[in-house]
Curated annotation (Swiss-Prot):
Record's protein name: Protein MOTHER of FT and TFL1 homolog 2
Pfam family, one: PBP
Induction and repression of expression: Induced by abscisic acid (ABA).
Source superkingdom: Eukaryota
Lineage: Eukaryota, Viridiplantae, Streptophyta, Embryophyta, Tracheophyta
Stated role: May form complexes with phosphorylated ligands by interfering with kinases and their effectors.
C-alpha cells in the first residue's frame, strides 16, 4: 500500500482531494505514448485529448472516473478548488474509460500560473447509473470530489493517480 499512497500524501492529494484509502484496483493512464505516474510533468499541449485510462477489475463491476485540478486558478490561491475536468461513469472493469459514459466532457489542463496538480480518481459503483439518475454538476469551478462521492454513495477511491502541468511558454517569432 505504501508505494501507491506515499506519492499521494507527498503531493497533498490525500488530504486536499481524497481521504486516506487502500488501493484495490490497478489503474494506468497515458497521454499518447507517455504513461502518467504520480507527480510526473505533462505539457498542456500533450493533454488536449482525454488520456487512455485502463482499469483492472471484473467485467461485471462498474467504475466512475473523476479528473480535477485542486490548484485552480493558482496554487497560491486555489479559490476554485477543485476545478472539474472530466467525469466518466459506468466504466466496466477490465476495460478503459472510453467504454464508459461521459457525464462531463473532457477539458484538458490549462494552468495559468504555477505548477498545477491534476488528479484522476477512480471509484467502484454499487450499481449502474441509469440515464437521468445522475445530474452533471452545474459548474466546473469549486467541484468537490469527496462530496460527489458521498452523494452518489461511491465510498472511498479504489485508485488514484496525479500528474503536474504548468503553462507552456509562448512561441516567439523573430
Amino acid at each position: 500500500m505504501a508505494r501507491f499512497v506515499d506519492p499521494l500524501v507527498v503531493g497533498r492529494v490525500i488530504g486536499e482531494v481524497v481521504d486516506l484509502f487502500v488501493p484495490s484496483i490497478s489503474m494506468t493512464a497515458a497521454y499518447g505514448d507517455r504513461d502518467i505516474s504520480n507527480g510526473c510533468l505533462v505539457r498542456p499541449s500533450a493533454a488536449d485529448y482525454p488520456p487512455l485510462v485502463r482499469i483492472s477489475g471484473r467485467r461485471n463491476d462498474l467504475y466512475t472516473l473523476i479528473m480535477t485540478d485542486p490548484d485552480a486558478p493558482s496554487p497560491s490561491d486555489p479559490s476554485m478548488r477543485e476545478f472539474l475536468h472530466w467525469i466518466v461513469v459506468n466504466i466496466p472493469g477490465g476495460t478503459d474509460a472510453s467504454k464508459g459514459e461521459e457525464m462531463v466532457e473532457y477539458m484538458g489542463p490549462r494552468p495559468t500560473v504555477g505548477i498545477h496538480r491534476y488528479v484522476l480518481v477512480l471509484y467502484e459503483q454499487k450499481a449502474r447509473f441509469v440515464d437521468g439518475a445522475l445530474m452533471p454538476p452545474a459548474d466546473r469551478p469549486n467541484f468537490n470530489t469527496r462530496a460527489f462521492a458521498a452523494y452518489h454513495q461511491l465510498g472511498l477511491p479504489t485508485a488514484v493517480v496525479h500528474f503536474n502541468s504548468q503553462r507552456e511558454p509562448a512561441n516567439r517569432r523573430r
